[in-house]
């Protein structure tokens, strides 16, 4: 056990997880109508108490600003009335989605007449470790409840007041609908030791999902004894092929880089085919400079861009470290590549496996890129910002998985279930 984790905290977190498991057993038996009614009531309560949640969030925002939190993280931390309303609307959307629990994945009869069915069932107790993302508290709660799971949350110190206010709204709604408030709990009261305890709580928590920066995710993956679904940091690439529509590419890149810089689906790297580099790089550099984006470039890109006399440009030579860095800031790495093969090799070497985009009109280039890129999501002629559970129609998301086991890409309701085999017999015995 970690030196920073006392036996008392570990035991307390395990007790919370066990309480959640007992509450989850009842939730797992609830029908879809009951779960949907619960979600709609939670959404209404969030709207009713949005000002209270905003007030708690204002205190978290003030403290985080005083502690020097950067602009990207502050944007993620903000949970004002409009964002609470958007989260509540997301809960309502989850209520409209098909319930995956009880779905028959496949079924067939054996030659001896035994009927086998593979059926979707809840995972159980889902642990979530995240940071400065109060919307995740609502998203995860709604997805867990609809999919029949309990949630144990460590939302981090920066959003502790906001998360407490949000869970304070959800708990009485659970009880009013005949469920236990222990279905959705926080371990924030234990600080970092709470997260450590969750990672140690194998046999109490069924699966653990980290959501945040690369440091947080890797710490959980390396140290957790509980099975982990790895959500990835986003070292996201856009490749401009020689066949690409350059006029179309500029707004795509600006959207992908600047709409929200602190999110995992924001573009971080731009690769440009050498045949269009001289024409395209001055155009995109000017557009990025206007958006106050700092450019980290290879030598070829630097030479082309520096000769364009672009006003307000912050142009720098990239280091090897740049190609592996998720900036989460107004910064972008740019590299000229000789061909599609080199672009694909560079992406597969340096990507975190999240999302990559190609701007191209040549069908063969598009097909090769989409087949060979080893990432969870590949986008053609569109912004990388579309990698999102809400955009994909999931209502919300548990996270975006960059691993290949169990789930990959945005994780919605179906990805929060596992399966159970049921055999229906009439007295069969094995010979």
Swiss-Prot record:
Class of this enzyme: oxidoreductase
Known EC number: 1.2.1.41
GO molecular function terms noted in the UniProt entry: glutamate-5-semialdehyde dehydrogenase activity; NADP binding
InterPro entries: Ald_DH/histidinol_DH, Ald_DH_C, Ald_DH_N, Aldehyde_DH_dom, G-glutamylP_reductase_CS, Glu-5-SA_DH, GPR_dom
Keyword Amino-acid biosynthesis: yes
NCBIfam families: PRK00197.1, proA
Leader sequence residues: none
Pathway: Amino-acid biosynthesis; L-proline biosynthesis; L-glutamate 5-semialdehyde from L-glutamate: step 2/2
Entry keywords, A to Z: Amino-acid biosynthesis, Cytoplasm, NADP, Oxidoreductase, Proline biosynthesis
Entry superkingdom: Bacteria
Record has Cytoplasm as a keyword: yes
Broad class of where this protein is predominantly found: cytoplasm
Protein known as: Gamma-glutamyl phosphate reductase
Protein location: Cytoplasm
Swiss-Prot/TrEMBL catalytic activity: L-glutamate 5-semialdehyde + phosphate + NADP(+) = L-glutamyl 5-phosphate + NADPH + H(+)
Lineage: Bacteria, Bacillati, Actinomycetota, Actinomycetes, Bifidobacteriales
A GO term from the CC aspect: cytoplasm
Role according to the record: Catalyzes the NADPH-dependent reduction of L-glutamate 5-phosphate into L-glutamate 5-semialdehyde and phosphate. The product spontaneously undergoes cyclization to form 1-pyrroline-5-carboxylate.
GO biological process: L-proline biosynthetic process
Record-stated family: Belongs to the gamma-glutamyl phosphate reductase family.
Any coiled-coil regions, as ranges: none
One Pfam family, short name: Aldedh
């Amino acid at each position: 056990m970690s030196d920073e984790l006392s036996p008392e905290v570990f035991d307390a977190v395990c007790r919370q997880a066990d309480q959640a498991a007992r509450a989850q057993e009842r939730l797992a038996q609830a029908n879809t109508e009951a779960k949907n009614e619960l979600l709609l009531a939670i959404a209404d309560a969030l709207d009713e108490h949005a000002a209270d949640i905003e007030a708690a969030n204002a205190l978290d925002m003030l403290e985080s600003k005083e502690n020097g939190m950067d602009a990207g993280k502050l944007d993620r931390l903000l949970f004002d009335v409009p964002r609470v309303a958007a989260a509540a609307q997301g809960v309502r959307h989850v209520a409209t989605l098909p319930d995956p629990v009880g779905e028959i994945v496949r079924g067939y009869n054996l030659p001896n007449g035994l009927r086998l069915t593979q059926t979707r069932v809840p995972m159980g107790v889902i642990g979530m470790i995240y940071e400065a993302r109060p919307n995740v508290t609502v998203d995860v709660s709604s997805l867990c409840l609809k999919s029949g799971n309990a949630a144990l949350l460590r939302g981090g110190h920066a959003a502790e007041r906001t998360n407490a206010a949000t869970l304070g709204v959800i708990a009485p709604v659970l009880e009013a609908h005949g469920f236990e408030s222990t279905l959705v709990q926080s371990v924030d009261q234990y600080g970092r030791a709470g997260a450590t305890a969750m990672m140690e709580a194998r046999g109490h928590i069924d699966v653990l999902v980290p959501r945040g920066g690369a440091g947080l995710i890797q710490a959980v993956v390396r140290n957790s004894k509980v099975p982990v679904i790895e959500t990835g940091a986003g070292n996201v690439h856009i490749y401009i092929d020689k066949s690409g529509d350059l006029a179309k590419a500029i707004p795509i890149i600006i959207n992908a880089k600047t709409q929200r810089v602190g999110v995992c689906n924001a573009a971080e790297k731009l690769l440009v085919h050498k045949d269009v580099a001289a024409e395209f790089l001055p155009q995109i550099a000017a557009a990025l400079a206007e958006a106050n984006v700092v450019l980290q470039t290879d030598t070829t890109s630097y030479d082309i861009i520096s000769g364009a006399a672009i006003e307000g440009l912050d142009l720098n030579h990239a280091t090897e470290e740049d190609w592996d860095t998720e900036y989460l800031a107004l910064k972008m790495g740019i590299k000229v590549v000789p061909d599609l093969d080199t672009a694909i090799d560079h992406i597969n070497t340096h990507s975190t496996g999240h999302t990559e985009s190609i701007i191209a009109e040549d069908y063969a280039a598009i097909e090769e890129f989409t087949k060979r890129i080893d990432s969870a999501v590949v986008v053609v002629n569109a912004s990388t910002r579309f990698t999102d559970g809400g955009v994909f129609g999931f209502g919300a998301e548990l996270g975006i998985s960059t691993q290949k086991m169990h789930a990959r890409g945005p994780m919605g309701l179906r990805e929060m279930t596992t399966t159970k085999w049921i055999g229906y017999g009439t007295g069969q015995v094995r010979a």
